[in-house]
Amino acid sequence: MMIKKLVTFEDLGFVQWGVLNEDETGVYSAIALEEAFFTPFPETLFEFVEQGNEGLLALADSLEQNERTGAVKAKPLGTIHILPPLPELHKNIFCVGENYAEHIEEFHKEKGRPLPKFPQFFTKAPTCVIGTEAAIDSHPTVTKELDYEGELAVIIGKTGSDIPVSEAMDYVYGFTILNDITARDLQRNHVQWFHGKSL
C-alpha cells in the first residue's frame, strides 16, 4: 500500500499523528492503528520519519490489515485540527532563493543585474511554522509589506554530506507545500534575509 500523506493533528487537545485516508476526508490515527494491530509506533511524526523505510513498512502493514478488518475508523477532518506536519523542528528551515528560472531572469533583467552563477541560500526560523488553515499573523507594527509565495518543501529523512547527485533522492523522505511568508520591507533593510523570513 502506498502511503501518500502523513499529518500531525490535534484531537480534543491531544497532539498525535496519522495518515490521510484514500479519499482525504479523514485521518487514521497512528495510536488507533497501534492499539488495533499491536504495531508500536513512535509518539511523534518526527520520530516516525527517523525510522525511515522500517517505519513506513510497519505503517503500510497496519493499513492493509485495517483495509481487511475495518477495525480503525478515520477521524473526519472537520473534527480535528491539522498542525504543521513536523511542528517541533530541531533546526532552521533551509531554503534556496531565486529558485524559479523565469522569475530569476525577470527579476535580474528588471534590476539590470547579471544572472547569478550560484544558488542563494537562506534560512527560516522553525518557530514561524504554522499549520494548514491557521491564521497568518500580519505583524502590523513590524511590517507593512507582508508577501507570500507557494514553495515545494523537501523533507530530508537521513543525515549525509558530500552526496553524489545520483544518490540525492535516497535522502529525501517526502515533500510538502510551504507558504513562504516574507516581510519584504524588512528583507530590503537587511543584507541577511533571516529577519524578513522568520516572523
Predicted regions and their residues:
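N-terminal non-catalytic cap/leader segment that marks the start of a structured domain
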Residues: 1-115, 119
